[in-house]
């Protein structure tokens, strides 16, 4: 059983690595964006609430996101573990997640943080933007995303370091090397 969080800045390879690890352990990869869209599509109470904000182009408030995460964690496929990808993004969300897990009699096993230098992230994201034809992902936008990550999400590293479950992973190297490092650490 593996209950994991994958963290790291945009372009670090969280989604790619989470995809590989979820197959190995046969556990769901839970992406905040995906479950928000699914909750809206399924017309759940939290989904209806989230839709109001999404339709207005606003950020969905923590209370709604946390409610949707809680609803997702009680589903049967999470009984043997899960990977949270893109959540939590703030210390407040991490504290709320701890409360949810306590309430559900669950504990996190590891928080995997993929560490990649900003210059490499910019290079990767610009390459991905060109490959996927995303003209809105220019260098300035990317640097803004990294700045937001560094100010809002980076404090989570200290939060999880204090719990003893943080696994710092060098995000440079081949996909296989990074996967093997993650597997050894969790």
Swiss-Prot record:
Domain of life according to the entry: Bacteria
Positions of AMP binding: 32, 37, 58-60, 86-89, 93, 134, 145
EC number: 2.7.4.3
Catalytic activity from the UniProt record: AMP + ATP = 2 ADP
LID, as annotated region: 127-137
SUPFAM superfamilies xrefs: P-loop containing nucleoside triphosphate hydrolases (SSF52540)
CC annotations in GO: cytoplasm
Pathway: Purine metabolism; AMP biosynthesis via salvage pathway; AMP from ADP: step 1/1
Enzyme class: transferase
Keyword Protein transport: no
Pfam families (alphabetical): ADK
GO molecular function, one term: adenylate kinase activity
Region NMP, residue ranges: 31-60
Classification via InterPro entries: Adenyl_kin_sub, Adenylat/UMP-CMP_kin, Adenylat_kinase_CS, P-loop_NTPase
Annotated ATP binding sites: 11-16, 128, 173
Subunit structure: Monomer.
Record text about domains: Consists of three domains, a large central CORE domain and two small peripheral domains, NMPbind and LID, which undergo movements during catalysis. The LID domain closes over the site of phosphoryl transfer upon ATP binding. Assembling and dissambling the active center during each catalytic cycle provides an effective means to prevent ATP hydrolysis.
Similarity annotation: Belongs to the adenylate kinase family.
Purpose: Catalyzes the reversible transfer of the terminal phosphate group between ATP and AMP. Plays an important role in cellular energy homeostasis and in adenine nucleotide metabolism.
Stored NCBIfam families: adk (TIGR01351), PRK00279.1-3 (NF001381), PRK14527.1 (NF011100), PRK14528.1 (NF011101), PRK14531.1 (NF011104), PRK14532.1 (NF011105)
Protein name as it appears in the record: Adenylate kinase
């Amino acid at each position: 059983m593996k209950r994991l969080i994958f963290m790291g800045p945009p372009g670090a390879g969280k989604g790619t690595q989470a995809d590989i690890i979820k197959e190995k352990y046969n556990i769901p990869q839970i992406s905040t964006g995906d479950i928000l869209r699914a909750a809206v599509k399924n017309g759940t109470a939290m989904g209806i609430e989230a839709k109001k904000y999404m339709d207005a182009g606003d950020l969905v408030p923590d209370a709604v996101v946390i409610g949707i995460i809680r609803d997702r964690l009680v589903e049967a496929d999470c009984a043997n573990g899960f990977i949270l990808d893109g959540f939590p993004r703030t210390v407040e969300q991490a504290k709320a997640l701890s409360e949810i897990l306590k309430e559900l009699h669950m504990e996190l096993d590891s928080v995997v943080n993929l560490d990649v230098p900003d210059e490499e992230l910019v290079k990767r994201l610009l390459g991905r933007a060109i490959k996927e034809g995303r003209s809105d992902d220019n260098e300035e936008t990317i640097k803004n995303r990294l700045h937001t990550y560094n100010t809002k999400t980076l404090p989570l590293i200290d939060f999880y370091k204090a719990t003893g479950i943080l696994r710092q992973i060098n995000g440079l190297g081949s996909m296989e090397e990074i996967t093997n490092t993650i597997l050894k650490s969790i």
